[in-house]
Structures are given as C-alpha cells and as structure tokens.
C-alpha cells in the first residue's frame, strides 16, 4: 500500500486529511501544498463515490470520516448533507475524476510547491 507520510504520525495524518476533505466539501476549492493535494484527491474521490451511492450505510461511512461542520449558515446544512444533496448528484454521470489540481508556484516562506485543488 502506497501513501505519503506528510511528515506526520498516523493519527495526525488522518486528522489533517479529515480537515482538508471537510474544507474541500464546504468550499469546493482550497489552496494547499502539492503533496497534500495529491493525497487528498484519493480520499475526496472515495467520499464523492459514497455520496453517489446514497444509501444509509454510505452516509454513515462518510459521516465517520467528514467533520461535523456547518456548510451553509442560512440553511443550517452541514458538510455531509452538502456532500449527499448538492455535490454527489452533480457527478451522477461521471465515473471518477471529480477533482482538478492546478499548480500555483512555490510558497514564499519555504518554497513548497502550492496548488489549488477544486471540484470539477
């Protein structure tokens, strides 16, 4: 099994990916480092596939990973509801490839390659 360690322990890495997945679902576009974005891509694709399945078990699997944050303050919609009601129906006819990674250039402080990852 191949994955990036991202300079963190196992639990820290899982927490980072949970936060990034939740942010990407809520904002649909985030700026991060290239290594994080490439690792995030596979997790987000799996979450959207769960959303497309749409049954109770898929909803519970996604809820176990995605943080319980409010996505829309006016409607009170959280990240899971947005994933299943807004994002998943958008990709019903698409088999994978739900994200796009666009390179930005190096970060000013340490020169890390920065990218924008967004939902297509």
Curated annotation (Swiss-Prot):
This protein's UniProt keywords: Ribonucleoprotein, Ribosomal protein
Presence of the UniProt keyword Ribonucleoprotein in the record: yes
Any one Pfam family match given in the protein's UniProt record, by short name: Ribosomal_L17
Domain of life: Bacteria
GO biological process, one term: translation
HAMAP family: Ribosomal_bL17
Quaternary structure and interacting proteins, as annotated: Part of the 50S ribosomal subunit. Contacts protein L32.
Protein name: Large ribosomal subunit protein bL17
Organism field: Anoxybacillus flavithermus (strain DSM 21510 / WK1)
Encoding gene (name): rplQ
